Amino acid sequence: RRQRQMCIRDRLGVKKIKVGHAGTLDPLATGVMIICTGKATKRIEEFQYYTKEYIATLQLGATTPSYDLEKEIDATYPTEHITREMVEEVLQQFKGTIEQIPPAFSACKVDGKRAYDLARKGDEVELKPKTLVIDEIELLECNLPEIKIRVVCSKGTYIRALARDIGEALQSGAHLTGLIRTRVGEVRLEDCMQVEDFPEWLEQQEIEVINE
């Protein structure tokens, strides 16, 4: 936790205030990330349970070990049988309460160790399914073999794993090629500031300085 705080402080250019985040983004994802400072750090757990909205771009017909572009393609599958109607029907299968197995390349813990540390060493990682909720899922664009979807989901949802499962349900494969978190609770992308603008904004706030 302390290392995480130091990393955030360095990234934001702040040193002497309490700081934390209410949910990380995947390395290749962009979008809303709630940063809490000072007394607001006490609300981190509350923010973590807010529903999240994502816009995801999926490439059908190919998979990667990480389910995104972090790793290279490891297998290809046919896509000629896939139609827009088939995609729309499959997406609705994921609406509601579902069980999802997290990616091996994730921060989930296995016997006290991070899954991604084990996966990067080549160890086989077995993760248990987690119960989560997909409140909304819709097809935004369909340019086969690429599709773009919007997802509103609960805490703990891995959109990379959802891409994997959608690919399998389409009797093919899939991986993420783009991911934007567009909303956390009521905080939308258009309400946010760029990371580089944070120090200037912070100077205008009343903050509680901490002693290391």
Feature map (PLM): residue ranges:
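Catalytic/RNA-binding core of pseudouridine synthases
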Residues: 1-5, 9-212
